[in-house]
């Protein structure tokens, strides 16, 4: 079986610390208690101090220690490759606005990005065609049904409703301006690489595993075509979508990709603008509505951060204007969200008082 490469990482440490609330890092700015000059969502961000970074390191270490032994959930088994990924893997990473990544656990293990890719192809379409196309052709509402539901299409006259479910994601892929299939894939791959500031590999074993079992998505693609919601060849869009879900990504990569959204569309490492700042809130709104599938409302109620999950075990969350966090562990709950990743992100967000709906 083909293995994802494990990439080298800078200094990493081990885990453990007591639970306590210190920093107020969220709606009042990154680490506001320690850095009172920082203000508000989306404002200019100061460089974290060494003390701030030590505190973040303590938090990711403790979160890893707290939740590494949680045994709930199981790997996705409808995609054979995902069922074979070691269930004990668990990584957490925070990306700061000055380009540092603070991490614990298996953060260099490359896993399948799966549905998290939907966010970044949506960003590409917005960059090419503007945000209005999302409301006009994709939708901005939750389906109220599982992410791969055909019933949702039937109930809404083949309208995909959201770019963050499978139907809407394939429609999103079909909106990428491309001369041919090769150009189509190159644009999507280059866009992902830009958000990660890394060359993200297509894992052929995952791609084959998904292609051999994606009859359901092919049916959805044809339904979209029937309803005039597919804007390129239906099977080309389905195949490109399958490929983007098969990209290998590490927890570090995912934190940086989310950090680009937290940083107003500018990659915190490369300094390159990947998305107009005015479009970022629209992306985050989609994540809030449908980012964790049919438990998205519960996540917003409990945690209060825009987030996106994938059945490969990854979840990213964004504190707008401040920081981002990513976590990975393969065992999923019934909705398709990583159990350990949810616990880790929710606990760290609570420690940092990061709920964007709170004062």
What does each model-identified segment do?
Residues 1-21, 28-37:
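N-terminal secretory signal peptides
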């Amino acid at each position: 079986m083909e293995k994802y490469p494990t990439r080298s990482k800078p200094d990493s440490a081990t885990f453990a610390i007591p639970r306590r609330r210190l920093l107020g890092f969220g709606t009042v700015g990154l680490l506001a208690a320690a850095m009172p000059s920082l203000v508000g969502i989306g404002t200019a961000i100061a460089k974290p101090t060494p003390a701030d970074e030590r505190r973040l390191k303590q938090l990711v270490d403790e979160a890893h220690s707290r939740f590494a032994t949680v045994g709930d959930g199981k790997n996705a088994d409808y995609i054979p490759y995902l069922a074979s990924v070691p269930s004990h893997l668990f990584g957490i990473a925070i990306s700061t606005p000055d380009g540092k990544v603070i991490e614990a656990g298996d953060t260099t293990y490359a896993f399948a990005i799966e549905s998290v890719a939907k966010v970044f192809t949506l960003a590409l379409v917005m960059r090419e065609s503007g945000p209005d196309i999302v409301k006009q052709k994709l939708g901005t509402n939750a389906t109220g049904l599982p992410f791969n539901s055909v019933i949702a299409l039937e109930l809404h006259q083949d309208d995909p409703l959201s770019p963050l479910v499978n139907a809407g994601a394939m429609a999103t892929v079909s909106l990428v301006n491309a001369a041919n299939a090769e150009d189509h894939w190159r644009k999507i791959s280059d866009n992902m690489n830009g958000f990660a500031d890394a060359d993200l590999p297509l894992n052929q074993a995952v791609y084959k595993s998904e292609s051999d079992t994606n009859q359901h998505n092919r049916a959805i693609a044809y339904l979209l075509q029937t309803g005039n919601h597919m804007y390129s060849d239906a099977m080309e869009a389905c195949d490109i979508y399958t490929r983007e879900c098969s990209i290998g990504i590490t927890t570090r990569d995912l934190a940086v990709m989310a950090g680009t959204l937290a940083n107003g569309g500018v990659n915190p490492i490369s300094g390159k603008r990947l998305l107009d700042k005015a479009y970022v809130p629209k992306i985050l709104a989609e994540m809030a509505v449908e980012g964790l599938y049919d438990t998205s409302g519960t996540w917003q109620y409990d945690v209060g951060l825009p987030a996106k999950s994938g059945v490969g075990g990854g979840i990213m969350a964004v504190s707008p204007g401040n920081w981002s966090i990513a976590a990975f562990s393969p065992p999923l709950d019934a909705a398709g969200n990583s159990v350990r990743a949810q616990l880790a992100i929710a606990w760290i967000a609570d420690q940092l008082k990061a709920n964007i709906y709170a004062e």
